[in-house]
């Protein structure tokens, strides 16, 4: 197989007229030729791998020196020299050749470089999912890296002159993707010669003055950056992207005004635009700021390009302005109760509360009703640390407290391009129009799938939050039951201790009453626990049900079908008219599947809401148990104190007064409560028969009575305390 591979390599060299190159041995000093990475005008790039696993990219001139023009030879040598001299993380490193290559010559040296194994930016832009531009995070990374590289070149008095997606490669270092400039063959030091003696670079990206063969400055790279970054965020170049860069194209674009950052044809006329064309993955904040930057770099006049004027004085702001724009961090917050994503601009000083204030202002959910979580479901609690130091991912979720997830999903706004296809599925469309419609459809469906994925993610987080509350309640209940049982034991011990003593009957009765009240409290707490146990089982069942949700698969299948149609149309039916019938059918199918999936999970949402509501009811009742435990502990202390000092007189002491007042208040409130069935319906608490008359209550066995006593004794006690 290896022999066959090198035969193919040999044929490649022959086909590229490289037959006069020195035959390259398969292995040299532990290095072996793996494959040809690519070929340019007169250069070829090989991948070499060392036996240790290290990789290098080596650029070799395909021709002999005698076959090159002097300008071509100088250009080649210039690139080698520049690449070896420059040191920047976003420019591919020029390295010393670690072995003797037979094609390395003094008058035509090889260029040895680091190997970037993730391909180039053009490969990224060609992906179907990027047909309307890459994601915002990736766009920011590319713009930061490449603008930094160009700024470095300019600081060294060098212009690149050939900025394009093919000349930007991706490197993967420690699972972090960085973007690097390659191919400085057209780069020129401005001190040498600032006239464009020949047309260089790719016409789609080069500055107008190079087309006119005028003198140029580093502002040619500003234009190229603008074209490149506009394509990065929209998927298309800004100015008549489907038109060849001819004299006619130039005549149209040179008429653009300062605010014009794009141009397209509509009904046969060229129309200029002042906005970034949609659809795009950019957030509103970043989009608005980039519009201002595009205005600066896409000026037709090279003398004005890249500059802003203040008090009549011009200043180059290309890199400073872009750095300021990109230095802000964008967080995406999925609002679970509204089924929408809001974006917020933050910086290194923004705290959790600052973001919550922004959310409150934006969607009218008060801070005290917000539960903000990170991507992994961890609740973000107010503190003084910067928000960015507490999150690993800038995708966050906000829930409205005591409010379920939205059950009826808002009807999505169907883009006009999709509506046209649905209305006239058999209408004949030209190639470019159908391509645009396909792009919009792909973006729309990906957007809907992304929203639904976040919705499912929010559903799992919501359930996790409820389960966490269940765990907390269970621990509190267990601890409280232990404390109440301990209190009952203390009362029993006190009763036994004083039973054979000299205390009178009234004193002993007080102890017995206290024991009965605490025993009744234990019984009430155990009843709550019995009601709580099924909630644990229900949460476990719901957790398994949520984990088994697999509703994205059907949506993705439809998306993949549309993506294949888009690719097929682009590659095989270029510039042919076609009908959108199949795409229209798939759009209908997608919307139908989406509706079915929403319906399927709505029942789970209702069950989670019910679980949370039942837990809230038990928490409210158990708060009374905790309060009464505190009351009974204080009563025990009072009894013990009076008995120990032999000054315990039930008829005159504060304890008896408190106990009598408390019981009277309890009975009065209990009697009143029987006339308020809505307020104290048994179904609201422990789901047993409601009672309307005080005389029907069994004070020994009825759990509802126990709970009412607990709740109102708590109220009465604190009413009395507040009057003292």
Model-derived features with residue positions:
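Protein kinase glycine-rich loop
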Residues: 34-41, 45
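Glycine-rich ATP phosphate-binding loop
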Residues: 44-65
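Conserved N-lobe beta3->alphaC-helix segment of eukaryotic protein kinase catalytic domains
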Residues: 60-86
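Short beta-strand micro-motifs within the conserved protein kinase catalytic domain, predominantly
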Residues: 93-107
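Conserved short submotifs of the Hanks-type protein kinase catalytic core
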Residues: 105-120
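Activation segment signature within eukaryotic-like protein kinase domains
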Residues: 142-143
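Conserved catalytic-loop aspartate of Hanks-type protein kinases
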Residues: 221
């Amino acid at each position: 197989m290896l022999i066959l591979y090198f035969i193919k390599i040999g044929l490649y060299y022959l086909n590229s007229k490289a037959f006069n190159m020195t035959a390259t041995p398969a292995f040299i000093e532990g290095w072996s030729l793996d494959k040809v990475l690519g070929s340019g005008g007169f250069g070829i790039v090989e991948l070499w791998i060392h036996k240790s696993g290290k990789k290098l990219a080596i650029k070799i001139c395909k021709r002999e020196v005698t076959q090159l023009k002097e300008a071509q030879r100088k250009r080649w040598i210039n690139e080698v020299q520049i690449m070896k001299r420059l040191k920047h993380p976003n420019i591919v490193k020029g390295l010393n050749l670690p072995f003797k290559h037979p094609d390395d010559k003094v008058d035509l040296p090889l260029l040895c470089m680091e190997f970037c194994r993730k391909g180039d930016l053009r490969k990224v832009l060609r992906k179907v999912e990027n047909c309307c531009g890459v994601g915002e995070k990736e766009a920011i990374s590319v713009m930061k890296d490449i603008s930094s590289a160009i700024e470095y070149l300019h600081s060294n008095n060098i212009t690149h002159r050939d900025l394009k997606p093919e000349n930007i490669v991706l490197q993967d270092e420690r699972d972090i993707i960085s973007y690097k400039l390659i191919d400085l063959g057209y780069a020129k030091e401005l001190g040498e010669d600032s006239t464009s003696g020949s047309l260089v670079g790719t016409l789609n990206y080069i500055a107008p003055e190079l087309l006119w063969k005028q003198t140029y400055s580093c502002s040619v790279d500003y234009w190229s950056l603008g074209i490149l970054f506009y394509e990065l965020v929209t998927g298309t170049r800004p100015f008549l992207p489907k038109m060849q860069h001819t004299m006619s194209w130039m005549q149209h674009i040179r008429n653009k005004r300062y605010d014009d950052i794009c141009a397209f044809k509509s009904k046969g006329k060229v129309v200029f635009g002042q906005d970034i064309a949609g659809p795009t993955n950019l957030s509103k904040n970043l989009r608005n700021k980039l519009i201002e930057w595009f205005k600066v770099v896409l000026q037709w006049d090279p003398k004005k390009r890249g500059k802003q004027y203040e008090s009549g004085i011009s200043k180059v702001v290309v890199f400073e302005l872009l750095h300021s724009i990109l230095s802000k961090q964008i967080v995406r917050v999925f609002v679970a109760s509204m089924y929408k994503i809001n974006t917020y601009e933050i910086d290194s000083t923004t705290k959790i509360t600052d973001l919550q204030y922004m959310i409150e202002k934006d969607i009218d959910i008060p801070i005290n009703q917000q539960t903000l979580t990170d991507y992994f479901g961890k609740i973000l609690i107010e503190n003084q640390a910067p928000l960015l130091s507490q999150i690993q991912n800038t995708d966050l979720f906000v829930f409205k407290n005591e409010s379920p997830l939205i059950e009826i999903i808002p009807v999505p706004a169907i883009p006009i391009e999709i509506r046209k296809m649905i209305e006239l599925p058999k209408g004949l469309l030209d190639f470019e129009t159908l391509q645009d419609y396909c792009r919009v459809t792909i973006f729309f469906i990906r957007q809907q799938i992304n929203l639904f994925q976040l919705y499912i993610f929010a559903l799992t987080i919501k359930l996790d939050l409820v389960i966490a509350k269940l765990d907390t309640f269970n621990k509190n209940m267990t601890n409280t039951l232990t404390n109440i049982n301990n209190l009952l034991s203390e009362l029993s011990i006190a009763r036994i201790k004083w039973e054979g003593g000299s205390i009178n009957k009234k004193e002993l009765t007080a102890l017995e009453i206290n024991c009965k009240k605490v025993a009744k409290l234990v019984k009430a707490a155990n009843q709550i626990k019995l009601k709580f146990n099924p909630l644990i089982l229900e949460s476990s069942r719901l957790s398994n049900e949520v984990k088994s949700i697999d509703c994205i698969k059907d949506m993705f299948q439809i998306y993949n079908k549309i993506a294949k149609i888009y690719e097929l149309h682009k590659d095989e039916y270029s510039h042919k008219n076609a009908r959108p019938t199949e795409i229209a059918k798939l759009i209908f199918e997608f919307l139908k599947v989406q509706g079915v999936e929403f319906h399927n999970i709505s029942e789970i949402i209702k069950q989670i809401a019910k679980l949370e509501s039942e837990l809230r009811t038990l928490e409210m009742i158990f708060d009374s148990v905790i309060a009464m435990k505190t009351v009974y502990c204080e009563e025990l202390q009072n009894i013990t104190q009076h008995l120990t000092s032999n000054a315990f007189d039930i008829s005159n002491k504060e304890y008896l007064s408190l106990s009598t007042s408390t019981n009277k208040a309890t009975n009065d409130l209990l009697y009143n409560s029987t006339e308020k069935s809505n307020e104290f319906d048994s179904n609201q608490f422990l789901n047993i028969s409601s009672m309307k008359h005080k005389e029907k209550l069994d004070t020994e066995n009825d759990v509802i009575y126990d709970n009412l006593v607990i709740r109102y004794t708590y109220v009465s006690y604190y009413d009395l305390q507040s009057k003292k």
